[in-house]
């Protein structure tokens, strides 16, 4: 990381700072480098999306559920007729 990279002030509880310091020492990094590594690792993993991103996604999900129910009901009716 270059000196001209953006700076960011970050407050954390003392116990978290101590854990970060211990982890950084164990990994042979500065606390800044360790914190950056933790953030990069977290951002590289896909995060689960909770809720709907917009109305179109919500509507698509509702329509999908309706279609599933229609297919299920149709198959159930067809099965009843064959037995």
Swiss-Prot record:
Binds DNA as a homotetramer. Keywords: DNA-binding, Repressor, Transcription, Transcription regulation. Pfam families: Arc (PF03869), Repressor_Mnt (PF11423). Mnt acts as a transcriptional repressor of genes ant and arc. The gene is mnt. It comes from the Viruses. GO terms for biological process: regulation of DNA-templated transcription. This is Regulatory protein mnt. One of its GO terms (molecular function) is DNA binding. InterPro entries: Arc_DNA-bd_dom (IPR005569), Arc_rbn_hlx_hlx (IPR013321), Phage_P22_Mnt (IPR024421), Ribbon_hlx_hlx (IPR010985). Belongs to the p22 arc/mnt family. The keyword Ubl conjugation does not apply.
């Amino acid at each position: 990381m270059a000196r001209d990279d953006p700076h960011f002030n970050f407050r954390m509880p003392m116990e978290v700072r101590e854990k970060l310091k211990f982890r950084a020492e164990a990994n042979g990094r500065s606390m800044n480098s360790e914190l950056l590594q933790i953030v990069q690792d977290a951002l590289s993993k896909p995060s689960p999306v909770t809720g709907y991103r917009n109305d179109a996604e919500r509507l698509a999900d509702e329509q999908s559920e309706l279609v599933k129910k229609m297919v299920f009901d149709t198959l159930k009716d067809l099965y009843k007729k064959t037995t």
